[in-house]
Swiss-Prot record:
<dbReference type="GO" id="GO:0004488">
    <property type="term" value="F:methylenetetrahydrofolate dehydrogenase (NADP+) activity"/>
</dbReference>
<dbReference type="InterPro" id="IPR000672">
    <property type="entry name" value="THF_DH/CycHdrlase"/>
</dbReference>
<keyword id="KW-0554">One-carbon metabolism</keyword>
<keyword id="KW-0378">Hydrolase</keyword>
<dbReference type="Pfam" id="PF02882">
    <property type="entry name" value="THF_DHG_CYH_C"/>
</dbReference>
<keyword id="KW-0521">NADP</keyword>
<dbReference type="GO" id="GO:0005829">
    <property type="term" value="C:cytosol"/>
</dbReference>
<feature type="binding site">
    <location>
        <position position="233"/>
    </location>
    <ligand>
        <name>NADP(+)</name>
    </ligand>
</feature>
<dbReference type="GO" id="GO:0035999">
    <property type="term" value="P:tetrahydrofolate interconversion"/>
</dbReference>
<feature type="binding site">
    <location>
        <position position="192"/>
    </location>
    <ligand>
        <name>NADP(+)</name>
    </ligand>
</feature>
<keyword id="KW-0368">Histidine biosynthesis</keyword>
<keyword id="KW-0511">Multifunctional enzyme</keyword>
<comment type="pathway">
    <text>One-carbon metabolism; tetrahydrofolate interconversion.</text>
</comment>
<dbReference type="GO" id="GO:0006164">
    <property type="term" value="P:purine nucleotide biosynthetic process"/>
</dbReference>
<comment type="similarity">
    <text>Belongs to the tetrahydrofolate dehydrogenase/cyclohydrolase family.</text>
</comment>
<feature type="binding site">
    <location>
        <begin position="167"/>
        <end position="169"/>
    </location>
    <ligand>
        <name>NADP(+)</name>
    </ligand>
</feature>
<dbReference type="InterPro" id="IPR020867">
    <property type="entry name" value="THF_DH/CycHdrlase_CS"/>
</dbReference>
């Protein structure tokens, strides 16, 4: 058996095409496009690529990203908080995202909590996370929302199924577990202290892997016919010195066991950016229409 490939890049392209039409219609109706401000502090090279992709994708669908800013690493926490306050008050800015990680002298928790919940398009403000816990509408974390959209578009049944999540971060593991619960899955969350991980993953009808460890999950850990969602993205170097991107799943072996699997790249990553754009449009509509 060879798994069906869940192509997140193709799905993201389709959703972004739909967003482009929606943004054009909204701009004609309200006289301005949705506005997104991505704040990047410092010179982390990985962050540079992520920020560039977010701004480029935003522009492509018609979102105004002119108020995105690259800030010096020496910027103080007080200065960053003051900037967020100004963006919170700016009626042309519908979404604010602070690119992580931040320099060590800045408390990321205080910074993320300063963003107005209605402009928190990364879905990390306590208010939005609380709404998720309560099952209420709100801006959802981008990567978990992307995972759920992939599962939905693929027609993967969740009600009554066993879903195992590897990882418990506030960025992915915890919110995706809550979203799976919302769809009536029986959810098991595992992490670095979990005993006999393989015994648990072999129970999964749906396995979501967000461990941050290259190729952690092998074919022996996967139940035949399971759906595997690989959230990880890691750059590794082989014995010849060649660099390549891999996920947290050993794709080549697991694809022979699973019913469906997301690749790395072209899997969850493109959907994360797309959900950011969708959240920005959602915030815009909530503020101007509702």
């Amino acid at each position: 058996m060879s798994a069906a490939i869940l192509d997140g890049k193709a799905l993201a392209a389709r959703i972004q095409a739909e967003l482009t039409c929606e943004v054009q219609s909204l701009q004609e109706r309200f006289g301005r496009p949705p506005g997104l401000s991505v704040l990047w502090v410092g010179d982390n090279p990985a962050s540079a690529a992520y920020v560039r992709n977010k701004n480029k994708s935003g522009q492509a669908v018609g979102i105004d990203v002119a108020k995105s800013q690259h800030l010096k690493a020496s910027l103080s926490e007080t200065q960053l908080l003051a900037l967020i306050d100004r963006l919170n008050a700016d009626v042309t800015v519908d979404g604010i995202l602070v690119q992580l990680p931040l320099p060590e002298h800045i408390d990321s928790g205080r910074v993320l909590n300063r963003i107005a919940p209605e402009k928190d398009v990364d879905g990390l403000h306590p208010v939005n996370l609380g709404r998720l816990v309560r099952g209420e509408p709100g801006l959802r974390s981008c990567t978990p929302a992307g995972v759920m959209r992939i599962l939905s578009e693929a027609g993967v049944p969740l009600a009554g199924k066993t879903a195992v999540v590897i990882g418990r971060s506030i960025l992915v593991g915890k919110p995706v577990a809550l979203m799976l619960l919302e769809k009536d899955a029986t959810v098991i969350t595992t992490h670095s202290r979990t005993a006999d991980l393989a015994a648990i993953t072999q129970m999964a009808d749906v396995l979501v892997v967000a461990a941050g460890r290259p190729e952690l999950v092998t074919a022996a850990m996967v139940r035949p016919g399971a759906v595997v969602i690989d959230v990880g993205i890691n750059r590794v170097t082989d014995y010849e010195g060649n660099s390549r991107l891999v996920g947290d799943v050993d794709f080549d072996s697991v694809r022979d066991v699973a019913a469906a699997i997301t690749p790395v790249p072209r899997g969850v990553g493109p959907m994360t950016v797309t959900m950011l754009l969708a959240n920005t449009v959602q915030s815009y509509k909530q503020r101007l229409i509702e």
